[in-house]
């Protein structure tokens, strides 16, 4: 397949998954999806030859290990066709329009940010809402192996009471629109192997770390 056809396949796979998503309103609006990407593309992203970070400090916050984080930016796109295809799919105007309609948001002027996460045993995240500069948050779960279906995101209510855990089957995912009540976490649990996921954000123009962006000079229009 050509680069363009890979991107279109990713786009159409996501749009189908979004249309068939499970829409949940409590404790805040979020969407659960399955079969998000074409299976071969999901497998290619899972198999990216990027070593999982080691020697990390687990503090409940990703920023503690900022120097080891991996983004689907211009450098990654030159090396890995699968990352380029995913970025093009989520920069596509049809994708943007569908997200805006489904989620009731306006992404004009935002920039696409995609992070490839490879979490190992000991990793956890404290309850947080996502910072305000993030206008959209989505996770694609790409884990395999024993127990990986239980490695999903934990959802909390505004009183920080646990409500449920997103299913974490391979190529499934979660969407929410960050707000003051969108508390979520990754509670401590055994991770046998590597917990792989992709975090997709559209971030506001004031985002400073431009190297993290898929297209730092091309905001959504």
Where are these regions (language model features)?
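Non-heme Fe(II)/2-oxoglutarate
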Residues: 3, 9-13, 17-102
């Amino acid at each position: 397949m050509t680069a363009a056809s890979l991107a279109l396949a990713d786009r159409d796979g996501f749009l189908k998954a979004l249309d068939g998503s499970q829409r949940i309103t409590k404790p805040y609006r979020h969407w659960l999806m399955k079969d998000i990407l074409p299976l071969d593309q999901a497998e290619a992203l899972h198999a990216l030859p990027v070593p999982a970070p080691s020697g990390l400090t687990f503090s409940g916050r990703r920023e503690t290990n900022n120097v080891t984080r991996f983004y689907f930016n211009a450098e990654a796109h030159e090396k890995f066709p699968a990352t380029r295809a995913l970025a093009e799919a989520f920069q596509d105007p049809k994708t943007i329009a569908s997200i805006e309609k489904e989620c009731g948001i306006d992404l004009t002027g935002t920039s696409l940010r995609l992070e490839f996460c490879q979490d190992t045993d000991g990793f956890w995240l404290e309850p947080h809402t996502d910072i305000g500069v993030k206008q959209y948050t989505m996770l694609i779960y790409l884990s395999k192996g024993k127990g990986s279906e239980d490695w999903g995101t934990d959802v909390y209510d505004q009183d920080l009471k646990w409500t449920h855990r997103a299913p974490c089957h391979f190529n499934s995912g979660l969407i929410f629109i960050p707000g003051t009540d969108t508390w979520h976490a990754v509670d401590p649990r055994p991770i046998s192997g590597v917990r792989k996921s992709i975090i997709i954000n559209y971030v506001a123009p004031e985002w400073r770390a431009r190297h993290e962006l898929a297209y730092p000079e091309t905001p959504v229009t």
